[in-house]
């Protein structure tokens, strides 16, 4: 069975530094579980790790697709499983590091995307329907077949609405039912999982997030978005809807001021961190590490190593 170490947590909590230190001590390689860092050219807004910051540790699933290409949890699972096997086959420890909870769950709950993968014709039909009758109409189709998704999703979130309708068409089940059934396959995975979630005082975390946004602006986030626009990447693309990118696009289009854009990026990032923590709390397998209780990161690293070895 393959040993798999997972270092998760909210944005700006410090997953990168901890995972690199663990990789150095455990002879590991890191697989990124970040839904934005998979895109090429989107470096500043995604807080993508630099080559120097990697400290010689190989990183996987960073810069793997162009910004116009679609990438989803099924794509991640396929590539991550391939990387895990490759790393393990070379006598090294695969370390998953990131904050996209769905990506992590696709591995440790062995989500099966083969039965309900895609129905392109149905997707095209629903997209055309939204253009003809409006997003609200397509959203209303959920009411009778998947009330939970109907209440949870907004009409403007067309991509997720279409996905929920697609899953129901293929399986006859709501997307939440389908997910629960996949989660029952928990112990069918070929991994010995050690799952840690880093956390810290909420106010301190929010301060770190605000500071990170200021640093991004100083590094040239606006210039990065301008360059992406000049390369032909548009606001309707999945990648350009990421936090930081969509707000700067609003600013560049004259819809909001620069101060408003910065405010919205900070607010959106804080809200995202809150959602991440809520997601991770649902998983009873995860072991939480409160960073506030430690003076040095090395203490956290040593604690994780001890817990892994004592398991």
Curated annotation (Swiss-Prot):
Q: Which GO terms describe its biological process?
A: tRNA modification
Q: What is its EC number?
A: 2.5.1.75
Name any one Pfam family assigned in the record.
Answer: IPPT
UniProt superkingdom? Bacteria
Site (Interaction with substrate tRNA) at 100
- Record bears the keyword Acetylation: no
Q: Which cofactor does it need?
A: Mg(2+)
Catalyses: adenosine(37) in tRNA + dimethylallyl diphosphate = N(6)-dimethylallyladenosine(37) in tRNA + diphosphate
EC class of the enzyme, as a word? transferase
Extract the GO molecular function terms from the UniProt entry.
Answer: ATP binding; tRNA dimethylallyltransferase activity
Where are the residues of the annotated region Interaction with substrate tRNA? 34-37
- The keyword Lipid metabolism appears for this protein: no
- InterPro entries the record matches: Dimethylallyltransferase, IPT, P-loop_NTPase
Keywords, sorted A to Z: ATP-binding, Magnesium, Nucleotide-binding, Transferase, tRNA processing
Q: List the disulfide bonds.
A: none
Provide the residue positions that the database annotates as binding ATP.
9-16
Residues reported in the UniProt entry to bind substrate: 11-16
Q: Its biological function?
A: Catalyzes the transfer of a dimethylallyl group onto the adenine at position 37 in tRNAs that read codons beginning with uridine, leading to the formation of N6-(dimethylallyl)adenosine (i(6)A).
- Self-association and partners: Monomer.
Task: Give the record's family classification.
Answer: Belongs to the IPP transferase family.
What is this protein called in UniProt? tRNA dimethylallyltransferase
What is the source species?
A: Clostridium botulinum (strain 657 / Type Ba4)
């Amino acid at each position: 069975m393959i040993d798999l170490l997972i270092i998760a947590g909210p944005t700006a909590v410090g997953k990168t530094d901890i995972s690199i230190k663990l990789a150095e001590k455990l002879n590991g390689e890191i697989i990124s579980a970040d839904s934005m860092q998979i895109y090429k050219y989107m470096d500043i807004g995604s807080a993508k790790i630099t080559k120097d910051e990697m400290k010689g540790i190989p990183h996987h699933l960073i810069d793997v697709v162009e910004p116009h290409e679609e990438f989803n949890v099924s794509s991640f699972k396929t590539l991550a499983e391939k990387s895990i096997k490759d790393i393990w086959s070379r006598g090294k420890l695969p370390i998953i590091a990131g904050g996209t909870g769905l990506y992590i769950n696709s591995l440790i709950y062995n989500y099966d995307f083969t039965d309900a993968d895609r129905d392109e014709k149905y997707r095209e039909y629903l997209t055309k329907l939204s253009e003809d009758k409006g997003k609200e109409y397509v959203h209303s189709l959920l009411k009778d077949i998947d009330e939970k998704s109907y209440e949870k999703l907004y009409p403007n979130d067309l991509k997720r609405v279409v996905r929920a309708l697609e899953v129901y068409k293929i399986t006859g089940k709501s997307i939440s039912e389908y997910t629960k059934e996949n989660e029952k396959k928990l112990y069918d995975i070929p991994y010995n999982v050690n799952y840690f979630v880093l956390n810290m005082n909420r106010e301190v975390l929010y301060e770190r997030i605000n500071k990170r946004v200021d640093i991004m602006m100083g590094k040239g986030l606006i210039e990065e978005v301008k360059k992406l626009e000049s390369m032909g990447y548009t606001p309707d693309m999945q990648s350009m809807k990421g936090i930081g990118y969509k707000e700067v696009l609003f600013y560049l289009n004259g819809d909001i001021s620069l101060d408003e854009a910065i405010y919205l990026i900070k607010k959106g990032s804080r809200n995202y961190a809150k959602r991440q923590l809520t997601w991770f709390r649902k998983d009873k397998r995860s072991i939480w590490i409160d960073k506030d209780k430690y003076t040095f990161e090395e203490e956290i690293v040593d604690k994780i190593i001890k817990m892994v070895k004592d398991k």
